[in-house]
Amino acid sequence: MRLSRYFLPILREVPKEADIVSHRLMLRAGMIRQESAGIYAWLPLGLRVLNKICNIIREEQNRTGAVELLMPTIQSADLWRESGRYDDYGKEMLRIKDRHERDMLFGPTNEEMITEIVRGSIKSYKSLPLNLYHIQWKFRDEVRPRFGVYRSREFLMKDAYSFDLDAEGAKHSYNKMFVAYLRTFARMGLKAIPMVADTGPIGGNLSHEFIILASTGESEVFCHGDYLEMAPPPADVNFDDAAAIQQVVNDWTTLYAATEEKHDAATFAAIPAERQMAARGIEVGHIFYFGTKYSAPFNAKVLGPDGAEHLIHMGSYGIGPSRLVAAMIEASHDDAGIIWPDAVAPFQVGILNLKVGDSAVDAACADLYAKLTAAGVDVLYDDTDERAGSKFATADLIGLPWQILVGPKSLADGKVELKRRVDGSRELVTPAEAFERLKG
C-alpha cells in the first residue's frame, strides 16, 4: 500500500481525552476515532490489526475442531427471562422494543442464544461433543466507559461454547480451549499466564483468566516467576489425545497463579521469595465450565447411550479482540509509539523514500515495493513529500516492525538502511539483501 493513497489520519498532538497509553497511541496513530461515549470507529490501520488478531484466533479455534457460526447482535428478551438472567445485568444491558412492542436487547453475551440453538438441533449424544464459536460485536452500557477500546461500550468478542454429554467430556473440552488459548496468545507474541479466577455472573465452578503482565494493568495478580520461562504448547499438539492435553493443563496449573479475587496469601508466601511475582495484569481471555447452569432452565437434553435423557454440560470461552489490541499496546510501547509483535502488525515492512523525486531513490523503492508485495509481504510504502524526520516518526508511531530507509547517500554506495523497530538497531545492506531478509 502506498501511503499517498492510504487513509492514515495521524495526530501529532497528544489527545487530551486519552488517559492511558493505548488510548493515546491508537488515536495518534489513526487507528480509531471516537463517535460517542465508549463507541469507536475502527479506521483502516486499526482494522488491519484487528483482522490479523481475529485470523489467529480462528486458526487456533479451528485447530481444536471448533466450528464457526454467526449469531445476531439483537436478541429476544424472552431467552434471557428463560435463563433467569434478564435482571442480572441491570442497566449494563441495553434494552429496546421493536415496532410490535416486543422486548429486545443488544446482546452482552450469548449463552442463552447458543443454548437455544443447540436445544432445537441436537437430540442424541452421537452429535456430541460440539464446540461452536463466533466473532461478533457486543454491547454493554458501562456507567463510565473509559480508556478507549480497553473498556468501551461496544466491543468485539470471540465467544465459544462447548456441549458435552457429561462432566468428564466437558472437562476435556475445557482443557482443549485452555491449550488453544495458550497457543493463540503465544502466536501473537504475548506471554499469557492462566490464573484461577472468579466466575462472576457467567456462573459455574471452574474458571481461568489469561493474564498478560503490564504496569498499567487494571488488577493485581500473583504468580510463580517460572511461568515467564515456560514454552507454549507445540503446533502439532494432538487435541484428540485427552491425556496429552490434560498434561499440558497440569504443567500450566501446578505452579501458583491467581487473580486478586482468588489470591491465597499463605500459598503464595510458600513460594521462594526470589520466584514470587506480584504485579499488575490485563485480562486477555477468560474460560468457564458451568455444567448444566444453562441447559437446565432451557431443558437442553440429549438421549444418552443408556437410552435416558441427559442435560448437556456446557462451557464458554471468551477472547476480546478489540480489547486485545489495547492490551498489546499497553504491554509493548515506547516514547516513540507502538511496538507490535510481528504477527499482528498492520504492515510487516515500511519502505521510507527519503528523497521523493530522485530517480534512483524512486526506482529502488518501487523495485523493493513490487518484489516484497509479490512475495506476500504486507508493505506500507511512504512515498509522500513529508520530510525525513516526519516519516521516521510516523513509522515508529504506528509500529512498523521492519523499516527500509532509502536515501540518495546510502544508495550511492549500493546500500539501504534496515531498521528493526523493537530495539532500534540499524544496518546497511544491499536492496537485494533487504529483500531476502524480509521476503518471509
UniProtKB/Swiss-Prot annotation:
* Pfam family for this entry, one: HGTP_anticodon
User: Any idea which UniProt keywords this protein has?
Assistant: Aminoacyl-tRNA synthetase, ATP-binding, Cytoplasm, Ligase, Nucleotide-binding, Protein biosynthesis
**Any Gene Ontology biological process:** prolyl-tRNA aminoacylation
Task: Give a yes or no for keyword GTP-binding in this entry.
Answer: no
Gene Ontology molecular function, alphabetical? ATP binding; proline-tRNA ligase activity
Keyword Mitochondrion found = no
Q: Do you know which PANTHER family this protein is assigned to?
A: MITOCHONDRIAL RIBOSOME PROTEIN L39/PROLYL-TRNA LIGASE FAMILY MEMBER, PROLINE--TRNA LIGASE
Where does this protein reside within or beyond the cell? Answer: Cytoplasm
What biological function has been recorded for the protein in this entry?
Catalyzes the attachment of proline to tRNA(Pro) in a two-step reaction: proline is first activated by ATP to form Pro-AMP and then transferred to the acceptor end of tRNA(Pro).
The record's annotation in InterPro entries points to: aa-tRNA-synt_IIb, aa-tRNA-synth_II, aa-tRNA-synth_II/BPL/LPL, Anticodon-bd, Anticodon-bd_dom_sf, Pro-tRNA-ligase_IIa, Pro-tRNA-synth_IIa_bac-type, Pro-tRNA_synthetase
Source organism phylogeny: Bacteria, Pseudomonadati, Pseudomonadota, Alphaproteobacteria, Hyphomicrobiales
According to UniProt, the name of this protein is Proline--tRNA ligase
Share what the entry says about its subunit structure, partners included.
Answer: Homodimer.
| EC numbers on record | 6.1.1.15
Its EC top class is ligase
Q: Name one GO cellular component term.
A: cytosol
Annotated family: Belongs to the class-II aminoacyl-tRNA synthetase family. ProS type 2 subfamily.
Primary location: cytoplasm
Q: Describe the reaction catalysed, as an equation.
A: tRNA(Pro) + L-proline + ATP = L-prolyl-tRNA(Pro) + AMP + diphosphate
